[in-house]
Amino acid sequence: MKTSKTASESGINLEIIFAGRSNVGKSSLLKELFGAKVRVGKRPGVTLRPTHAQVSDLLITDMPGFGFMSGVKERKQDIVKDKTVHYIEDNAGRIKIAVLVIDGPAFPEIVDRWDSRDQIPIDVEMFDFLREIGIDTIVAANKMDKVKENESDPLLNEVAIRLGLEPPWQNWKHIIAPISAKKGDLKTLKGLLRDRLHEMKRDDLFKYI
């Protein structure tokens, strides 16, 4: 599968983007989700621009990690965030699905820390932005293997609350997908992606997901 920084855009009818902080396991998720079927390139160092893979008329885009990035100045972090927003705005017509990857166990604490400074956490800001411009958004709550089974539902309720969604989280199973990329547990996310492709009458793309 051919990948490039600026994938050939001929014949693209729909796009799925993957976004998230730089330390939430997004690259592991992409590798586990698509494997050898679709190579979404991970260039050495910090990814500062989108990376693409095209299959059929579907473009899969790995957005640069936003927020704190080791060894990257704050000004450049802001530029990455702005470029990400501009990319999404410019391509909103063809971006049919966005997968926002979060660190599930750490998410409530991260949001509360930002709230205590009277700042909107970038994950929440991105979630609201994607929904405001009409992009169907899935929140992949990664690293759930670190959470005990009896603590999973209470944690996911807290995740829902921080996203502005009324708990219980089970009311939002079409949006929140608890996963563990490291353990290869992506069943819920795959199911939600396929549900959406089915609604678009694009079952032909199931073989890539």
From Swiss-Prot:
CDD domains tied to this protein: YihA_EngB
InterPro entries named in the record: G_ENGB_dom (IPR030393), GTP-bd (IPR006073), GTP-bd_ribosome_bio_YsxC (IPR019987), P-loop_NTPase (IPR027417)
Entry similarity comment: Belongs to the TRAFAC class TrmE-Era-EngA-EngB-Septin-like GTPase superfamily. EngB GTPase family.
Cofactor: Mg(2+)
GO MF entries: GTP binding; metal ion binding
Binding-site residues, GTP: 20-27, 45-49, 62-65, 142-145, 179-181
UniProt keywords, alphabetically: Cell cycle, Cell division, GTP-binding, Magnesium, Metal-binding, Nucleotide-binding, Septation
Gene field: engB
Coiled coil: none
Function: Necessary for normal cell division and for the maintenance of normal septation.
UniProt binding sites for Mg(2+): 27, 47
Domain of life: Archaea
Domain EngB-type G, first and last residues per copy: 12-203
Disulfide bond positions: none
Protein name per Swiss-Prot or TrEMBL: Probable GTP-binding protein EngB
GO biological process: cell division
